[in-house]
Amino acid sequence: MCGRYVSPEQASIERAWKIDRTSSNPFPRRFNVQPTTDVPVLRLDGRALVLEAARWGLIPHWWKQDKPPSFTINARLEEAADKPMWREPLRGSRCLLPAEGWYEWQALAGGKQPHYIRRSDGRPACFAGLMSIWRDRPSCAILTRAAAGPVAQVHDRMPVVLADAAHAGWLDPALKDATRYAREHALADEFTHYPVSKRVNDARNEGPDLVEPLRP
């Protein structure tokens, strides 16, 4: 799964993608993004690439209860086409979540050790995402897959990080088989990771020191 990540500031997002329109206040750089908070997402509106805020934790448009559903921050790629929660967004409401990297917790004999995972080339690790609008509020989920490459040393799941050339295709409303597309265009071996401070465990902690390598 992916339960915490690092979100780039808006200026970095605008340098990496040709944004046509923004519909939110400027996004700051965040080093400890947690579920249910608003995060930057990229989506298509017609032909325009829009940067906007969405709640991390998808709420389907048909949700009847006042309390949002639990456990909707991640959608398993291998199940998304069949599950009612994900099926409709996968078909017609896909998005991208810009990220610098993410955290995973490695199970060790003495407890869980957080690791920071990022692309080896330093480029943004853009997550494939799903969106929905509930009571006029956008929300989103990150697609995940079985871990591969170096990430498998830390955890058994990882976000679907799309290759740069696949971003436009993922957002294209004409895409027919999104599951296959994500599987074929997901990065696997292009990552590095290292242990970081357990300060990241507390969602109240924030700052660049969270991604500093843990000193022996």
What spans do the regions from the language model cover?
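Short linear sequence motif anchored by a di-proline
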Residues: 1-216
